Amino acid sequence: MESNQIIYILFAIIFFGAWFLLLLVLSKVSGWQKLAISYAAPEKFLGEKLRMQSIKMGRAHYQSSATLGTNSEVLYLSVLLPFHIGHPNLTIPYSDISGVEHKSLFLGHVEIRVAKASSVKIKLRKTQADWLEANSNNIWKYDRA
């Protein structure tokens, strides 16, 4: 094997190893792992979806890489395939979710808390929370400021 081939192989191993480790750390600091303990999606999700969304969870910001989904029973969360390591799809029953609107000077957001992982904060844009509310057949509502 030539030295160039060895360098390419080592680079690939290091790159994919670092990517794997980074995603595991991200799932830990965001709280995704904690949510997955109780809310990992058992099957394919049936409902409305918004793809390529940005959300904040814990100390992580999922920029245009999250999918939000809803039906009359659950909130569905997933990430794009390249980021799926350590991030199983989640289905969280609306009965376990509370949301509170927070207003700021220009844009507001809605902070979601989940019963079985109350330390995890999920921040959505108000428009995303409004979409969830409307497409959950108004089963879920957040507290407005």
Which stretches of residues belong to each language-model region?
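Short, surface-exposed coil-to-beta transition loops
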Residues: 62-65, 87, 109
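Short charge-dense sequence patches
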Residues: 43-50, 79-87, 126-127
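Phosphoinositide-binding peripheral membrane targeting modules
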Residues: 72-107
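Anionic N-terminal interaction surfaces
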Residues: 2-72
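Generic detection of short hydrophobic beta-strand segments and adjacent strand-loop junctions
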Residues: 50-53, 92, 122
